Amino acid sequence: MKNIKSIAGVALLAMMATTSHAAKSVTVGELQGFTGPLESMIGAMSGGANLAVTEANASGKFLQGTINVVQGDSVCIDPAVAIAQAEKMVNEDNVMAIMGPNCSGNTIAVIEGVIVPNGIVSI
């Protein structure tokens, strides 16, 4: 299931990139609970997401550009931290999509507070 979501997310980004002929690279945020109660599972989740990005970049079919990933730690249990990390990704890193966060309280807060108001794709 995780692989399907990662592949679907990368496919979505590839389709979006084909509509913008000037794009040479796209930045995607990976907002995970690198610390906190899900810390022990995040390595595998992050690895899967990054494998999908690596494969997409290696294919050369992404308008001859690349997908860049920036990471942020949502800490899983504090929506304020997750929102701050997502805002940084949008305002400083200029992400076009955010993968995560993966804890329900953080997910709702980030979607309502950052993703929807800024028109960012949620993966």
What are these regions (language model features)?
Residues 25-44, 102:
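Short beta-strand segments enriched in small/hydrophobic residues
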Residues 40-47, 55, 59-123:
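Beta-alpha junction/loop-to-helix N-cap segments that form part of ligand/metal-binding clefts
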Residues 18, 35, 104-107:
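Ser/Thr-centric signal marking residues that sit
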Residues 2-5, 24, 61, 88:
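Context-gated lysine
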Residues 1-21:
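Gram-negative bacterial Sec-dependent N-terminal signal peptides
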Residues 20-30, 60-66:
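Immediate post-signal peptide segment of exported/extracytoplasmic ligand-binding proteins
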